[in-house]
């Protein structure tokens, strides 16, 4: 393959809220060999205390989000816990064109849409699972960003999402962040670098 024809791969990472997606991704994102970068999602939810606009998410109003949908500026979008989340197309394709391997940390609903749109050879999909629902609930509580009602909604949603894990190429158990990150790193070295 000629150098000019090379393009990056999309790495879809999903899992229930609180499973540790960001924690695991943060441990592998700086592996130089893998040439990884984040796709920054757009959301209507309010930022958490440590989050920055344009870094963690593009935080927008409901009106701005709906405008992006109408203009066809999102690869996918989904509604979760009364908030909308979506993947802006323009930046995603720019990064892939620069031969970057782009991590899409997205909800199951959004991942399904992306997999329906993309060519099969352009992505791999990975689903993170918790050791148990009890542990997932504990993680959501200690995160201390959700009300009891929101946690209840997220657990209910997690039970539905966990039933869809076999629709992904790989499943990683996150019982220990370091071990889960090592498994993710191994998968990426094997499946992303082999395509280069």
UniProtKB/Swiss-Prot annotation:
InterPro entries: GK/Ca_channel_bsu, Guanylate_kin-like_dom, Guanylate_kinase, Guanylate_kinase_CS, P-loop_NTPase. It is found in: Cytoplasm. Disulfide bonds: none annotated. It catalyses: GMP + ATP = GDP + ADP. It comes from the Bacteria. Its EC number is 2.7.4.8. Keywords: ATP-binding, Cytoplasm, Kinase, Nucleotide-binding, Transferase. Pfam families: Guanylate_kin. Residues 8-189 form the Guanylate kinase-like domain. One of its GO terms (cellular component) is cytosol. ATP binds at residues 15-22. It is an enzyme of class 2 (transferase). GO terms for molecular function: ATP binding; guanylate kinase activity. Essential for recycling GMP and indirectly, cGMP. Belongs to the guanylate kinase family. This is Guanylate kinase. The gene is gmk.
């Amino acid at each position: 393959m000629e150098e000019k024809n090379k393009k990056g791969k999309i790495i879809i990472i999903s899992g229930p809220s609180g499973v540790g997606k960001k924690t695991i991704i943060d441990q592998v994102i700086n592996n130089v060999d893998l040439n990884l970068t984040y796709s920054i999602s757009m959301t209507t939810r309010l930022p958490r205390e440590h989050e920055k606009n344009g870094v963690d998410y593009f935080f927008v109003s409901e009106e701005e989000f709906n405008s992006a949908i109408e203009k066809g500026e999102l690869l996918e979008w989904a509604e979760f816990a009364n908030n909308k989340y979506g993947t802006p197309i323009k930046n995603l394709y720019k990064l892939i064109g620069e031969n970057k391997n782009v991590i899409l940390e997205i909800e199951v609903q959004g991942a399904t849409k992306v997999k329906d749109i993309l060519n099969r050879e352009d992505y791999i999909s990975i689903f993170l699972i918790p050791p148990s629902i009890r542990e997932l609930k504990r993680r959501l509580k200690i995160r201390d960003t959700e009300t009891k009602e929101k946690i209840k909604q997220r657990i209910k949603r997690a039970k539905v999402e966990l039933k869809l894990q076999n629709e992904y190429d790989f499943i990683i158990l996150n019982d220990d962040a370091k071990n889960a990150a090592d498994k993710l790193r191994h998968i990426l070295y094997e499946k992303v670098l082999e395509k280069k």
